[in-house]
């Protein structure tokens, strides 16, 4: 989606530097409608350590998830892709309807028997602009465990097992 990286002045400053709130939401609505995800997982509503971009992302995602299922919103992408009613939205560190993704440290066949955490480390290693003294093993990163989430929105009911983002979602 090619938005300017950097440390902006709060949510409104970030949105302004990205072309305005409606522009940003419309771009994400278009992607949701195009790819039709069943589940979306995003940043902590407080931006983990308060980073303005990290705070802006869940704000945009929450609004885009609502709009993507509404045919009266962003009609151009609706005409091209139809609507998409996302089934579940998880926020990192969200305190309600918590999910502990303990499988984060277990190898997964879908990842060539690597752990999701090891794959996150590979991704972080590519995110050069964020290194500046950070590592996936630092105390600061461990303060915001990457396996703790909360179910912010659901169309399919609340999780009972609380260990699978796709719980209650039938294959389709």
PLM region spans:
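Active-site beta-strand->loop->alpha-helix modules in alpha/beta enzyme cores, enriched
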Residues: 1-74
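The feature marks non-catalytic terminal segments
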Residues: 67-172
């Amino acid at each position: 989606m090619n938005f300017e990286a950097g440390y902006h002045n709060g949510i409104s400053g970030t949105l302004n530097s990205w072309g305005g709130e409606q522009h940003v939401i419309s771009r994400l609505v278009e992607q949701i409608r195009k790819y039709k995800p069943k589940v979306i997982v995003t940043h902590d509503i407080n931006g983990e350590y308060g980073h303005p971009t990290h705070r802006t992302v869940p704000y945009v995602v929450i609004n885009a998830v609502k709009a993507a299922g509404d045919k009266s919103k962003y009609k151009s992408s609706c005409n091209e892709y139809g609507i998409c009613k996302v089934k579940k939205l998880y926020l990192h560190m969200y305190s309600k309807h918590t999910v502990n993704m303990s499988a984060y440290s277990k190898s997964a066949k879908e990842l060539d028997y690597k752990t999701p955490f090891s794959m996150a480390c590979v991704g972080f290693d590519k995110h050069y602009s964020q290194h500046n003294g950070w590592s996936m093993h630092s105390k600061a990163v461990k303060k915001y465990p990457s396996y703790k989430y909360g179910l912010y929105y659901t169309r399919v009911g609340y999780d009972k097992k609380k260990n699978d983002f796709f719980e209650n979602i039938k294959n389709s």
